[in-house]
């Protein structure tokens, strides 16, 4: 006789009216054991409840059509209302939406992991979504778009890393009822109809994710949630980040000159650039927070009617690198250091001088050295302005 399909195990469990097992992450002897149990349950076709930063969610393995079907019926979800797909990272999302627009990539980098679901075109022929069962594709993308999310909770992210394929994820409530924000609510609502609950206490926000439709370079909020539309539109801005060593002379001068050149090109004031969707900043690989610019740099900028006096240095951090659309370095060694630490930023990290020459460090030198440095920066930036406003 053949083996019983693993996905049938949970169906028999339901027939025996087995209550779901609740695993408390906060009091677990080894959280990894909880994660491995969840992975096994999902691989066998079970429905598992997970905490997220928004509300608790019900998840099934996306390749398991039977599990997806049971999830739909458990929720009482209307036909044609799509389920979301959880992936482990913004980079992973590109496997499912290879044609992701620059705006969508920008939002993915800046919002994930986090409480935003991006609704994107899922019809690309190279998408891994094409490998899912037809019934699953109908459930997650009935109109050709797919809602992707990277939840900001370590438990579900670790499960995604260990599981073969993404998760189909939906809020842990029946259709039309309030979302569950605790494990007890889930147990009371669904009882033995789900197989496992991962409990990590109340959810951080207690509110659903914001659902955003991104088409080309336009966005539309489909469902209000944790992240406001105003914040989302701010996150849509193009970010240019200049990097040097201490963030006290070269990179802040580049930031200030770049603001001036962009404002001239766009016929606005430097203060209005953010309203035009452009954010310009700077940081230093070895910078201390709150440092003042060198007096020579302030003086040289003042000669061009630019004010650098209020600048405060900041160290280069992972969020700055990941959020930036352009990371512009003063030297080749700065670029190498960034790529050694954050290799995923390679396509967005560039040397200021397109001819490959470094911008020499004027620190400790006379004012005239700072003037030459400013001239070099201005000349190099002239080749970048068209790219920034394209």
Could you say what each language-model-derived stretch is?
Residues 2-12:
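Extreme N-terminal basic, low-complexity initiation segments
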Residues 10-243:
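Active-site-adjacent structural elements in enzyme catalytic cores
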Residues 21, 166, 196, 279, ...:
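Conserved beta-strand segments of alpha/beta enzyme cores
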Residues 23, 148, 211, 308, ...:
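Short clusters of hydrophobic/aromatic residues that line enzyme substrate/ligand-binding pockets
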Residues 75, 262-266, 338-342:
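Conserved hydrophobic residues forming the short capping helix/wall of the S-adenosyl-L-methionine
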Residues 134, 138, 167, 172-174, ...:
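Phosphate-binding/catalytic loops
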Residues 237-323, 386-390:
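Conserved active-site segments centered on acidic
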């Amino acid at each position: 006789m053949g083996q019983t399909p693993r996905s049938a195990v949970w169906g028999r469990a339901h027939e025996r009216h087995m209550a779901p097992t609740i695993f408390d992450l906060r009091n677990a002897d080894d959280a990894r054991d909880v994660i491995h149990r969840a992975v096994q349950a999902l691989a066998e076709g079970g429905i598992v409840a997970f905490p997220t930063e928004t509300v608790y969610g019900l998840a099934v393995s996306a390749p398991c059509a039977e599990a997806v079907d049971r999830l739909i019926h458990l929720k009482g979800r209307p036909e044609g209302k799509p389920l979301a797909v959880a992936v482990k990272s913004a980079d992973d999302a590109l496997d499912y939406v290879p044609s992701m627009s620059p705006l969508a990539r920008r939002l993915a980098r800046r919002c994930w992991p986090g409480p935003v679901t991006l609704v994107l075109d899922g019809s690309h022929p190279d998408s891994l979504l094409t490998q899912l069962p037809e019934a699953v594709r109908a459930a997650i993308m009935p109109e050709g778009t797919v809602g992707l999310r990277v939840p900001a909770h370590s438990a579900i992210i670790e499960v995604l890393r260990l599981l073969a394929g993404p998760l189909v994820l939906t809020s842990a409530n029946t259709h039309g009822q309030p979302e569950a924000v605790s494990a007890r609510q889930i147990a009371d609502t669904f009882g033995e109809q789900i197989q496992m609950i991962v409990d990590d206490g109340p959810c951080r926000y207690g509110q659903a994710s914001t659902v955003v439709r991104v088409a080309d370079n336009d966005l539309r909020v489909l469902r209000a949630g944790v992240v406001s539309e105003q914040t989302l539109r701010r996150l849509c801005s193009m970010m240019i980040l200049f990097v040097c060593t201490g963030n006290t002379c070269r990179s802040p001068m580049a930031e200030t000159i770049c603001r001036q050149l962009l404002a001239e090109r766009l016929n606005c004031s430097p203060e209005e650039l953010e309203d035009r969707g452009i954010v310009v900043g700077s940081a230093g690989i070895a910078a201390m927070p709150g440092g003042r610019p060198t007096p020579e740099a302030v003086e040289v900028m003042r000669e061009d009617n630019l004010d650098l006096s209020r600048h405060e240095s900041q160290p280069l951090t992972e969020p700055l690198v990941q959020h930036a659309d352009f990371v512009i370095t003063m030297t080749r060694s700065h670029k190498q250091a960034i790529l050694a630490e954050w290799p995923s930023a390679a396509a967005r990290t560039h040397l200021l001088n397109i001819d490959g020459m470094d911008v020499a460090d004027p620190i400790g030198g006379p004012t005239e050295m700072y003037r030459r440095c400013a001239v070099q920066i201005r000349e190099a930036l002239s080749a970048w302005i068209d790219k920034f406003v394209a």
